[in-house]
């Protein structure tokens, strides 16, 4: 591995892993369950890196042996050919292991393991933008279904001509934020609306916000900053909706954020759900601020994920989705059915590459 700084990092990881292994073998740690869990978690997070590093060291040793055999087999063409083939295979293996190690050494996003709230908000384009927001809702629901994630509707504002002015989903499952964080931004659609009699192509947009779930400890909200009003819910509940004001409208005065929640059956449940959404929105605002600070120092190719950033165009006429961060085109029809894994993996790979370049520049 040519980069000395990577070897130094790997040796440091190896030392930490060995120390955590020794700690776990100490009988005294069993008397402190919290410390036991902390040490076990650290060790587990380093295990793949250490195992891959060991494979790399073994491959290096085998390569040295194969090169020695190649050197000594000058008078034996058959042996020389076999040794040359082994050298080539080992060099390819080492390249693969080195690339994997570089990715494993990248800093982990602390939010990657979290569930999310995904907000879809109609942008420019009037009724067509609301219909487009509904199409995106279906796309993400189908994708989540394919990932075996759980999806729950938290809040919705339906549009008169179909679709939604705004909708918020809760998505729970494994590694949800690590994938869907790349969906934040402006999604533009170019198509002939069903309401267009002249057959002209219109351009509309919807904005996606991806908010990792947070608890009370991570975001403090002063009760004095909240204004709450109630209303009669228009949702499920039979005659109850006409008698009891179960819907909750929360207004956060410092930021101007308003959350309207109607999906739960009681006012208390809707208030708790609205506070959950508000905490997630405030946390996302802080993440955006931090990302903007970072991006001013390092322009990421994948982009900042800012709400104002146009990340993708869906062109119906050409059956094409263009991801502007990647400069790549994908097929439209499968994407609308929730087949967006290739796009997300391409974003992940490009983000990793940008981080690797930054790591090399700082070394």
From Swiss-Prot:
Methylated by PrmC. Methylation increases the termination efficiency of RF1. Pfam families: PCRF (PF03462), RF-1 (PF00472). InterPro entries: PCRF (IPR005139), Pep_chain_release_fac_I (IPR000352), Pep_chain_release_fac_I_sf (IPR045853), Prokaryotic/Mito_RF (IPR050057), RF-1 (IPR004373). The keyword Zinc-finger does not apply. Keywords: Cytoplasm, Methylation, Protein biosynthesis. GO terms for cellular component: cytoplasm. One of its GO terms (molecular function) is translation release factor activity, codon specific. SUPFAM superfamilies: Release factor (SSF75620). The modification N5-methylglutamine is found at residue 239. It is found in: Cytoplasm. Belongs to the prokaryotic/mitochondrial release factor family. HAMAP family: Rel_fac_1. Peptide chain release factor 1 directs the termination of translation in response to the peptide chain termination codons UAG and UAA. This is Peptide chain release factor 1. It comes from Picosynechococcus sp. (strain ATCC 27264 / PCC 7002 / PR-6). The gene is prfA.
